[in-house]
A protein has these predicted regions:
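Extracellular/lumenal glycan-associated context and N-glycosylation machinery
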Residues: 1-77
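Acidic, glycine-rich A-domain
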Residues: 318-443
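An amphipathic, basic-hydrophobic helix/alpha-beta surface used to engage anionic
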Residues: 48-49, 57-339, 382-386, 400
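Generic hydrophobic, helix-prone segments enriched in Leu/Val/Ile
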Residues: 12, 16-19, 271, 312, ...
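Alpha-helical structural motif
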Residues: 31, 57, 250, 264, ...
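Intrinsically disordered, low-complexity regions
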Residues: 6, 39, 223, 260, ...
Length: 443
């Protein structure tokens, strides 16, 4: 039964998509009038319904027939920026080349994304937020869940772009507006040139395959830098890490060579003067290193709380000054990850790229993140934890960090009703979904 419903929903969505592309606004209105005329025509005493139905049907058939043939040869080139940001409108350029010897006018550019329909496994296993509050029929049939999944997988809104007249064997470049709806890779499938028929009801289409992708960064909120008490810590990466982050070791003195000393530390002038190997001695390197810990442990697909937590982590990452310190982004996906930025190791922008693609972890316990953080606590000057709850496992992580003397800031992201039920300590900051910006402004 579930598979039959899935096939019906999928076929209906495909039909609706093709109909929306084929019909102009006037064409959609004509179809609506056609349907209304059918309903009115059920009363055989009202001949006006038959007359309207016949007239509109004839117009639609003529328009559809005239749009069957679209002779034209075109090429397209899409010029995308490096990044976009979720929820922020932006523009990009598309170049259209007319390879025919006729001037083409009245065309409309439709830029197409990949198919947003979910797979059967996603349809069966996913749960729409608040689905338990729907009526029995909606829960069993699942169409609201289908519509929600399609909206979650639809990457952006791209309105049709009317084109200026295309000269024969010429090229025209236009700007297209797009509003990314979610973070992650936005995948384009191709572009379609639509030509309305003389009645303006139905469009003839000419599709051009043009696969491309654009990385959409998470939504960010304005906020001040989070101040974390902490001291410079010894970094066990040695000379290689110290030179990478820009802190060369401090020269102390010269001493006789010992077995195992690297050749690059030999002081050649002293070697030539005294006749035996002499090396330069340095102090160990210390600098500030903070951790940004992101809780990815949620079972829901497209969980808005998780998406807001990712946005909070992105906002914190860009607010922290990494010119004089390191920032480790830590989370658990298929495995435990730690990405470092600052002091020449990497730019904060690269952390945003990572956050654009991070997904929820459903097959590992929270303790996996606990161990990953504690394995690096010796090198940490401070820690910021962005959590999705306040259960025993998460409280244990915070207590363990505080017991080890690591200054820790804790941010809990959740819905208001969920946060109200939690007994949060005074040092734990709550961030309500829908009021994230206000919560971050209070930090």
């Amino acid at each position: 039964m579930k598979r039959l419903l899935y096939r019906w929903f999928s076929s209906f969505s495909a039909f609706q998509y093709r109909l929306d592309r084929r019909c102009t606004r006037a064409g959609s209105l004509a179809l609506g009038i056609l349907g209304a005329a059918v309903v009115i025509g059920l009363d055989t005493n009202r001949t006006v319904g038959y007359q309207v139905f016949t007239l509109v049907l004839a117009l639609v058939i003529l328009s559809a027939a005239s749009s069957l043939v679209f002779r034209g040869r075109f090429a397209a080139r899409r010029i995308l920026p490096r990044f976009a940001s979720a929820g922020v409108p932006m523009t990009y350029r598309v170049a259209i080349a007319n390879h025919t010897r006729r001037r083409q006018a009245g065309l409309v550019l439709l830029d197409e994304l990949t198919d947003p329909r979910p797979s059967f496994e996603e349809f069966v296993t996913a749960r729409e937020p608040g689905e338990e509050r729907r009526n029995w029929f909606d829960r069993q049939v699942g169409y609201p869940r289908w519509a929600w999944l399609v909206s979650q997988k639809r990457g952006a809104v791209i309105p049709p772009r009317p084109l200026p007249p295309l000269d024969a064997v010429g090229e025209t470049e236009v700007t297209v507006e797009i509003t990314p709806l979610r973070r992650g890779h936005l995948r384009f499938r191709g572009v379609t040139l639509a030509r309305p028929d003389p009645l303006g009801l139905v469009q003839a289409l000419k599709s051009i395959a043009l696969p491309q992708s654009l990385l959409v960064l998470p939504k960010r909120y304005p906020m001040a830098e989070i101040r974390i008490a902490g001291t410079r810590k010894y970094q066990p990466g040695g000379v290689a890490l110290a030179s990478t982050v820009g802190d060369s070791e401090e020269f102390v003195s010269l001493r006789d060579y010992r077995a195992g000393d690297p050749m690059r530390r030999i002081h050649w002038k002293s070697f030539a003067r005294v006749g035996r190997p002499v090396v330069k001695e340095y102090l160990d390197e210390f600098f500030v290193r903070h951790a940004l810990v992101l809780d990815t442990f949620t079972s829901q697909v497209g969980d808005p709380v998780f998406e807001e937590a990712v946005s909070v982590a992105a906002s914190i990452a860009i607010s922290m000054q990494t010119q004089e310190s390191l920032l480790d982004l830590m989370f658990v996906g298929p495995e435990a990850y730690c990405f470092t930025a600052g002091r020449g190791v990497a730019h904060t922008e690269q952390l945003l790229e990572v956050l654009a693609c991070v997904g929820p972890c459903r097959d590992k316990p929270f303790r996996a993140l606990h161990h990953a953080v504690l394995d690096r606590h010796d090198a940490l000057s401070g820690c910021v934890c962005v959590l999705l709850g306040w259960d025993d496992a998460r409280q244990e992580l915070v207590r363990h960090l505080e017991a080890l003397g690591t200054p820790t800031r804790v941010l809990i992201v959740g819905r208001r009703e969920t946060l109200d039920r939690l007994a949060l300590p005074g040092h734990v900051h709550r961030l309500e979904v829908g009021r994230i910006a206000e919560g971050l402004a209070c930090l």
